A protein has these predicted regions:
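Structured alpha-helical
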Residues: 1-111
Length: 111
């Protein structure tokens, strides 16, 4: 999120990724690619028609080769150029911990 001054206001670091995902919503099932990931949300690239305000359930294939990361409820916050920004609304505690651990390791490795 950008402030009118152009300064980034994000409180959580984002990790650029290329993780396959499957998702479903009200009368919608699709596939996509997560292009950036943070604890509170992600950006997804997909050919499916999503709308702001849609609610989705996601399963993200993580590089650790364990079971897919489960995001039980995510809300579409923005749409632009074939991508959508999702806010995670409900994530199981074990998946929340796994996501935070994965991000901490990956972001630490980049620094």
């Amino acid at each position: 999120m950008l402030h009118e001054s152009g300064i980034e206001l994000r409180s959580s670091p984002r990790l650029a990724v290329d993780y396959p995902t499957v998702f479903s919503g009200d009368k919608l099932v699709g596939e996509g690619t997560i292009t950036n990931l943070s604890v509170p949300g992600c950006a997804i690239r997909t050919s499916k028609h999503l709308k702001e305000g849609d609610y989705l359930e996601l399963r993200v294939l993580m590089p650790d080769r364990q079971a897919p990361l489960a995001i039980d409820v995510a809300k579409v916050r923005w749409i632009a150029n074939g991508s959508a920004g999702l806010q995670f609304i409900r994530v199981r505690p074990e998946d929340q911990l796994r996501l935070a651990y994965h991000l901490r390791l990956a972001l630490h490795a980049d620094s």
